[in-house]
Structure formats: C-alpha cells, structure tokens
Amino acid sequence: MPVQWGIMSTARINEKLLAGARQTDALAILAVASRDTETAGRYAQAHGIERAYGGYDALLSDPEVEAVYISLPNSLHVEWSVRALRAGKHVLCEKPLGRSAADVDAAFDVAGREGRLLMEAFMYRHNPQTQRLVELVASGTIGRLALVRSAFSFAGRDAADIRLRTALQGGALMDVGCYCVSGARLIAGEPERVGAEQVLGGDGVDVAFAATMRFADGVIGHFDAGLALDSRDELEVVGEEGVLFLDDPWHCRQPMIELRRDGKVERIELEPVDSYRLEAENFCAAIRGTASPLLGRDDAVAQARAIEALYRAAELGQTVTLA
C-alpha cells in the first residue's frame, strides 16, 4: 500500500520530488499546504493533488496523511520537523535539516519518542553514481585516499530569493556547500578540524564560501560554494595511484565517473535514474519496515556539526577543531 504523503510548502524544489513520485507506486501525494488556502488550492489543482490546506498545522491534522515532505526555508526545517513528528507524521526534510547539531539531535529524540522516521533529504546519496564512487574508493582503485575536492555554485541574481536571506538561514554553505560537506564526509569520514573564508552579500548572507577540512590519516578536503559565481558542479577524489572525477556529482543527470590512472582515462558510465524517486522509495520502504533508511541520525547530526564548525571558522578567521 502506498504511503500517503503531504507536502509542506509550494517551493520550486517540490517539482523534482513530484516528478520522482510519478515514477513509483511506493507513495501517493495526498495533500499540499501553503500559508494561504488560495495558493495551496492553485498548486493542488495544477499538480493533481487531492487536498489543499491553508496552513501547515491543518495538513498535520489530516489523519490520512502518514508522512510529510518539508521544503520550507532552512530556518523552519527543525521547527516543523518536530511539529510534524509530534503530530504523528514521518518526516522527509529537505537538506540541510539544521544548522545546529544540538537542534538536529533533539529532533531525532522526538522522532524516537514518537516512533516515527525522520530523514534528511540528500537525494544524490541514493543515486547509483554515488554508490559506485564509494565502492571504487573503498576497493583501492586509486590507492590510498589523499584529497577530496568539490565545488557547487550558481549565479543567483534575484535579491528576493530566500536563499539570499540571512534570517531564513540562506547562504552558499547552507544551500549548495552542504552537498560538498556531505560528499567529503561520505568519502573521508568526519572532519577533525576545518578552516573557512566567506564573502558576505548585502543581507549579510554568505554568497561565496570556501573551506579546507582535515580528516583522519592526513586526508585533506577542499570545497568552494557560491550563489554569485558561475555555475560549477564537480567532485574530484584523489588517491596516491589515481583520480576519480565527477562532473555532475549532485544532480546525477548523466551519471559518469572518470577514472584517471597510469596516464590513461577510463569513463565508467551508469544508467540515468531519478535520485528523487530512489530517495522517496527508500523513505517509504523504511516506513513500511522493508528497508533501513539510507540516511539516519548519526549522519544528520554529524553534517550539522560540520556546518556549525565551518561557519565558526569563517566568522573567527581561524581553524576550528571538532570534538
């Protein structure tokens, strides 16, 4: 039986989730909520969604909604995740789940008490391209791991964009840099210390962010992210005996891993698959008890802890050691 979902907000990111949802029978989008009934109604009609609510609490009061997808501004992620969990709903919350490790950890406490699933939505983690990359590194294909370098940026020119508002926890690190942090952690483990620089825009939000991270065994991580830079989207994993390069590591639209070794280049191509569909299917299977969630508490808390440390390093202008 498909899991009955409600969508909290009418954000643009929903389009990608809805496209993935149409490809699977694991879920059904039953309801959508916005801050006002008219907006929710128009959205529901445009997307063939049965129920529309003018207010998020109204959606949470619907007894037939089993799970919610939260795509609200970053500053509201933890708050509404907790409210949804307390209302008895399972929660798939868009990344980043939170900027505070303590807040994220507390949200998982609520999930545990309520017997509900909470998962952070990093869709790229579900894609076979990502899983193949991890396998290649783990198998020693490039020898001992030495460096993880990545970038994610685009030129955001709309001053009204919520991603450019400090009060809503926008910014380069929270919006796109979080992918780079997640990817480095996936490959190299948890950072031991970090250093960072940021460039602030008119609202005091970081429009450019660059960081260096030190991992165990002398592995170095470096990334840069931006909301006012030309579009860049890449991940490079360097070992003592080779390099793995991805020119679309996060969206995974045309999955391909380039292996550079011994002066030769091998292109490992994979079949394209919708990451959002895979994410939704894993979430639903975990709800039904037929699979474990790919992303859980430990990963989400560690991700928030790294982001906290990176912001602190940028603000202080010095290296920050993680406990």
Model-derived regions: residue spans:
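C-terminal helix-rich "cap/oligomerization" subdomain common to oxidoreductases
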Residues: 1-2, 67-69, 105, 268, ...
